[in-house]
Amino acid sequence: MIQNISEFSKKLDVSEESIKQFIQDFDLEISDCLSPNLNITQNFERFAIENQEFLKKYDEDLNKEKTADDISKRIHQPKEKIEQIIQDQFPNIYDNGIYKSSISTFGIDNQLGGNYQFIYNYFGDKTELKQRDFIGYRDLFFYISDMLEPFLNPEQSENWGIQKAAGIIVYGPPGSGKIFWAKKIAEMIDFDFFEIRKSQLKSILVNDKKTSFDEYLSQILKKDKVILFLENFDEIMMQRQERQIINSDHEDVKESTLHNIEKFEKENIVMIGSAKELIGIEPEILAPGRFDVLIPVFPPNKQERAEMLLFNMTKNLNENATLLKILKNNKADQIPFWKETAEKMKVFSNTMLVDFTQSLKKRIRSLYMKNKTEGIQISQVILDASLKESASKLTGEYLNNVQQFLSEAEDNSYDRFAARIEDLKQELETYKAKDEPIRTIGFHINEE
């Protein structure tokens, strides 16, 4: 019998939050544990039923107040190491030395070398990168699932009156994968995905009859279970400024959206707007009951960058591909090879990573065509050349986008993404101008 995570947690007598945190603490692939619409996989069901007592202990511990001393005594590890892990991963939850939410004794023990092989025995080897639905971002996946809970769990509406979202904004720097996550949301709640084309934003004449975005929305409202995706949401829904040239089409879209948004929940319609930043968006749009679900989409962290580099280098290659043989000869078919390069790619977007791998593939092919051997060395020289080429999008404007995004993510959801936000702050700091503190842009690119 297929069960969603909410139903299954009740059956186990373990909180849903604990199951989600457990998957993150033990670095399990989401696709090994949950289907795209958050149903429990057979593999995870078998593990959970056979280890129900362990999960209950994990659940009890997660919700129990404890100090670093308590954790140290329980797992026989130095208090200083435990405090360092907590400070690195949960910088926002210090409260007089007592920890509760999100702090698992078992999770810390696992990071410090505790033996939990019995867990991994159920899942075999890690799912190959090329077979994964997405790489990393477990924290973002579960944050989104929490935001979508009214869609996934009707009991929230029936017993608590919690409304489904009518509008969602996914926001983040250019190239961070906002459309990917919008499609992932549609998949998670089993809605059809429609991307609004630029032509549909304009009022045009067809057979002497004017058609508008309002008419387009009227047609969509006749459908059921639809995600409407609107790119450049921050530009289209911008608050009017004095002496600003008004884009009449954008104003029509804004007014039509505000007029119809109350109908969205009733008709099972959700509009997702994609924005670089939230500042400047018309306040009426962000009002409760409208676009009040805000989902930050971060550039990948260092580990995610290494995994993405390997994924993009091996994507669509068959087992006899020449490039794959060259990668294997250099041990570049494994994540450790890419860690040094990933370390240098501070605040790189997903798009920049793809640009890097495309550039590197071309350079490797050029060397192969010249030397006709699979024994080519993937040297630091060609890695650095590809890195420099892909960094062309790392402009002052992009870095300012990242800084604004960080400010907004910190204001809206620091409690859920504290470690990711602090890491990104440190990476951004490496680009800040040291000699010209008065500059308005405040960033430069270090050329090596």
Q: Would you name each region that the model predicts?
A:
Residues 158-160, 348-354, 367-448:
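C-terminal engagement/docking regions of AAA+ P-loop ATPases
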Residues 129-336, 448:
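Walker A/P-loop NTP-binding motif of AAA+ ATPase domains
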Residues 1-13, 57-70:
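Primarily a LysM-type cell-wall glycan-binding module
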Residues 338-352:
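A short helix-loop-helix "switch/interaction" segment in the helical subdomain of ASCE P-loop NTPases
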Residues 47-64, 394-398:
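A short, Lys/Arg-enriched interface patch at domain edges and termini
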Residues 20-51, 83-102:
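Short, Lys/Arg-enriched alpha-helical microdomains
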